[in-house]
Amino acid sequence: MGLLFRVRDVLNRLPLSVAQLLMRISVGSVFFTAGLLKYHSWDMTLMLFRDEYKVPVLPPDLAARMAMMQELSLPILLFLGLGTRIATLPLFGMIAVIQTFVYPDAWVEHLTWASILLFLLMRGPGTFSLDHLIARRFGGQK
């Protein structure tokens, strides 16, 4: 039992910012990789948005372009920890659209992404971030 308590104590001393950095990198990588795939396979992307995804309201080419642009830009903000809380919001929206209209059976994966984003929205990016440096420099909160 003593070993378990020692392990727990060691883990409790690890900075939460390490986990926050890993969360930003992991969820950002999922979206960035999807954006790169859309960019490098643009004709296939358009075909998927037209024939398979069928996102309502938006024309397929506009929806594809918007998805690609968000998937390539918002993860960079997450990687840098810049505007992190704001960057999570459009990603939540993308997850909601994907879950509702595109891949409703992939709810476990979407819930995992959403949980990570929710943590970042609630707790911020941590000390290993530009948000933290800016807050320190200009006297804002962490």
Language model features with spans:
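Extended, low-polarity transmembrane helix blocks
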Residues: 1-43, 57-69, 73, 79-142
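Short Gly/aromatic-enriched secondary-structure transition segments
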Residues: 44-52
